[in-house]
């Protein structure tokens, strides 16, 4: 019987438990699209194949949670930054620590390798950007100019520029040769999370928390395009290989955009939640996402995705070359001039001292997969690399997930087995074979302490929202088969209850909206607080946070007690809104509050000053109440922890 033809556009490869605690960073290898690196709260970096459940290698050495991870272009080196501000670079082929770099005063929030030279750039919550020489083990230059955390760094394809994105709503371009800032791009209305250079032309794309992707001409340093329609902050973008379009990973969706003119070519539903990184290989787009301690990998068949103004042509036989569509942007834009190189493989750098090598180990968890990927047998260096085969698509009528394997964490000693029949081998450029240093099995570590549950917004199904929770308990002595009428009755009961919840929510929003339409923001917040519905307050703050000028001192008095409730909420969206609101209050009003409280009393009666002093005292008191809460949550990993640590730094002026 013939197998059904693969007709799916998107499918899930697998879901695995990557760490014994929260995953703080996930990144794909852009060269092969087959390697995944994860950093976690356990201070380790784990290497995975996107379609295999077993950990290939575990990299140790950091003493604080890992905040950011990045491969180099050839996927032979990997760098990881930690909460303490240190960087560690590993040689994956030699399975050794290469460098340990110290210098940042806060979390390392962004990393990137230079495309040609042996340099690494790092950005931090301390607002500084450092350029490191891997060979000399030192900082070459420090770039200062951002006022808030640096979230993303990218070298230009020719290696002459460095672009940085920050929470201060700006993108800055730095000239590496001159060591100074070339331009500042500041059209975004929210923190900038991700930036990508066009592979050929002088064009830069930036994704922001304002839910837009903006395109910048790097010859004139002007905005040439802006997308609309994203429902959540943009965190993952990637240009196509030919540069004709850009892929934007959103909440359970993939959008394909063009520019000049701005247009959305296609929208593809993908169940990846909030995607963390994207890569392209063999006309397939690979996406990875994380939720607490799990990571998931997904595939999108680009032959079935509309990437131009014309309709997609469907699957193309492997023997027929695929014609690439013409770029949508202007063809007159300047093109990068890449330096000529005689060898694509970088010179081998000597490892660090023996003491650092003992502290930082590369523990090979799966020797067979490690040899297949990093040390292929009978490899001849002058032989051109073979292309890896694309992942086979499941048939359309097969609704089961292709792979969903939960692997044991590498910290627990368990026998790792590999299934070669059902997995794809990773093909890499041939390198000289060498014998890896196989470290001993890691000793078991104690289980992490239980933490209060947090309902993440990056999920495929609602968590904690079950129809049974709204229905009365049914006593039954033995399980019986539910007939159709009973099932319909139960569904209707849950539906009625949910309608009541939504109707109440809409009624509350209508009440607040009536006050909001009069233009009185303070009264609107007061009415929302009086209703005693935190979700309505969150909705209002999401609007106010988009325009910082709406914030006033008397508004802070009302909002700060509500922020305390949001930071203690189990819903991620509530915590995120509370962090953003508290950050705006600290940045705009904390200096004013401290100055007014420290000022000597004036002579005579000044009613307006007395009112300001009273408001400042109330705000200061509430901020002091929030300070221990923020400090206790600053030890968390991931974007949560980064946000609370940044708030903790901003609140240092209270002490």
UniProtKB/Swiss-Prot annotation:
State any GO BP term from the record. Answer: cell division
Q: Which CDD domains match?
A: WD40 (cd00200)
Which classification does the entry list for the species?
A: Eukaryota, Metazoa, Chordata, Craniata, Vertebrata
Family label: Belongs to the WD repeat KATNB1 family.
Entries under Pfam families matching the protein? Katanin_con80 (PF13925), WD40 (PF00400)
- Protein function: Participates in a complex which severs microtubules in an ATP-dependent manner. May act to target the enzymatic subunit of this complex to sites of action such as the centrosome. Microtubule severing may promote rapid reorganization of cellular microtubule arrays and the release of microtubules from the centrosome following nucleation.
Q: Which UniProt keywords apply?
A: Cell cycle, Cell division, Cytoplasm, Cytoskeleton, Microtubule, Mitosis, Repeat, WD repeat
Residue ranges, annotated region (Disordered): 338-397, 411-431
Extract the HAMAP family matched here: Katanin_p80_B1
Entry superkingdom: Eukaryota
Question: Where is this chain compositionally biased, Polar residues type?
Answer: 339-352, 415-426
Q: What is its main location?
A: cytoplasm
Q: Where are the WD repeats?
A: 18-58, 61-100, 103-142, 145-184, 187-226, 229-269
- Describe, as the record does, how this protein assembles with itself and its partners: Interacts with katna1. This interaction enhances the microtubule binding and severing activity of katna1 and also targets this activity to the centrosome.
Q: Which PROSITE patterns match?
A: WD_REPEATS_1, WD_REPEATS_2, WD_REPEATS_REGION
What are the GO MF terms of this UniProt record?
A: microtubule binding
Specify whether Oxidoreductase is a keyword of the entry.
no
Subcellular location, record wording: Cytoplasm; Cytoplasm, Cytoskeleton, Microtubule organizing center, Centrosome; Cytoplasm, Cytoskeleton, Spindle pole; Cytoplasm, Cytoskeleton
Q: Gene of origin?
A: katnb1
Q: Which InterPro entries match?
A: G-protein_beta_WD-40_rep, Katanin_C-terminal, KTNB1, WD40/YVTN_repeat-like_dom_sf, WD40_repeat_CS, WD40_repeat_dom_sf, WD40_rpt
User: Where does the record place Basic and acidic residues bias?
Assistant: 358-374
Q: What is this protein called?
A: Katanin p80 WD40 repeat-containing subunit B1
Q: Name one GO cellular component term.
A: cytoplasm
């Amino acid at each position: 019987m013939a197998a059904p033809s693969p007709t799916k556009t998107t499918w899930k490869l697998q879901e695995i438990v990557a760490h014994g605690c929260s995953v703080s960073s996930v990144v794909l290898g852009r060269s092969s699209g087959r390697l995944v690196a994860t950093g976690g709260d356990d201070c380790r970096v784990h290497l995975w194949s996107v379609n295999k459940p077993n950990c290939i290698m575990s990299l140790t050495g950091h003493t604080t949670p890992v905040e950011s991870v990045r491969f180099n272009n050839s996927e032979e080196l990997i760098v990881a930054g930690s909460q303490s501000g240190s960087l560690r670079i590993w040689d994956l082929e030699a399975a050794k620590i290469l460098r340990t770099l110290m210098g940042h005063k806060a979390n390392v929030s962004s990393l990137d390798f230079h495309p040609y030279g042996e340099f690494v750039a790092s950005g931090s919550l301390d607002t500084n950007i450092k350029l490191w020489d891997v060979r000399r083990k030192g900082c070459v230059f420090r770039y200062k100019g951002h006022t808030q955390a640096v979230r993303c760094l990218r070298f230009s394809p020719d290696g002459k520029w460095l672009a940085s994105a920050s929470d201060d709503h700006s993108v800055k371009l730095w000239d590496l040769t001159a060591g100074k800032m070339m331009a500042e791009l500041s059209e975004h209305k929210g923190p900038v999370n991700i930036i990508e250079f066009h592979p050929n032309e002088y064009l830069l794309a930036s994704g922001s928390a304002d839910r837009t992707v903006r395109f910048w001409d790097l010859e004139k340093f002007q905005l040439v395009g802006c997308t609309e329609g994203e429902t959540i902050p943009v965190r993952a973008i990637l240009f196509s290989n030919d540069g004709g379009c850009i892929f934007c990973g959103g909440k359970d969706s993939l959008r394909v955009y063009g520019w000049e003119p701005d247009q959305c070519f296609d929208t593809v539903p993908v169940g990846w939640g909030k995607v963390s990184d994207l890569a392209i290989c063999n006309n397939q787009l690979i996406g990875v996402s994380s939720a607490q301690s799990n990571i998931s990998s997904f595939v999108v068949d680009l032959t079935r995705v509309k990437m131009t103004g014309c309709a997609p042509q469907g699957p193309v036989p492997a023997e027929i070359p695929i014609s690439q569509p013409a770029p949508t942007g202007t063809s007159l834009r300047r093109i990068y001039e890449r330096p000529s190189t005689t060898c694509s493989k970088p010179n081998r750098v000597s490892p660090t001292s023996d003491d650092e090598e003992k502290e930082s180990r590369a523990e090979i968890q799966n020797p067979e997969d490690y040899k297949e990927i990093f040390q292929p047998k009978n490899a001849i260096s002058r032989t051109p690399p073979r292309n890896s085969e694309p992942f086979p698509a499941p048939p359309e009528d097969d609704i089961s997930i292709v792979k969903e394997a939960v692997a044991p964490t590498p910290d627990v000693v368990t026998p790792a087995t590999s299934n070669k029949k059902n997995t794809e081998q990773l093909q890499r450029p041939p390198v000289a074979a060498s014998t890896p240093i196989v470290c001993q099995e890691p000793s078991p570590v104690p289980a992490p302490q239980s933490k209060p549950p947090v309902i993440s917004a990056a999920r495929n199904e609602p968590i904690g929202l079950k129809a049974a929770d709204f229905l009365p308990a049914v006593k039954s002595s033995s399980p019986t088969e539910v007939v159709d009428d009973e099932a319909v009755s139960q569904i209707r009961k849950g539906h009625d209850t949910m309608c009541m919840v939504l109707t109440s929510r809409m009624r509350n929003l209508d009440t607040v909206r009536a006050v909001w339409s009069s233009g009185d923001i303070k009264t609107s917040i007061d009415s929302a607080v009086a209703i005693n519905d935190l979700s309505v307050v969150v909705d209002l703050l999401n609007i106010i946070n988009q325009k910082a000028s709406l914030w006033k001192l008397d508004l802070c008095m009302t909002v700060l007690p509500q922020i305390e409730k949001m930071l203690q909420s189990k819903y991620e969206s509530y915590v995120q809104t509370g962090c953003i609101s508290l950050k705006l209050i600290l940045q705009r009003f904390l200096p004013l509050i401290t100055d007014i409280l420290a000022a000597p009393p004036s002579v005579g009666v000044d009613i307006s000053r007395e009112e300001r002093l009273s408001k400042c005292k109330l705000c200061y008191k509430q901020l002091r109440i929030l300070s221990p809460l923020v400090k206790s949550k600053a030890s968390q990993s991931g974007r949560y922890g980064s946000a609370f640590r940044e708030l903790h730094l901003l609140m240092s002026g209270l002490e």
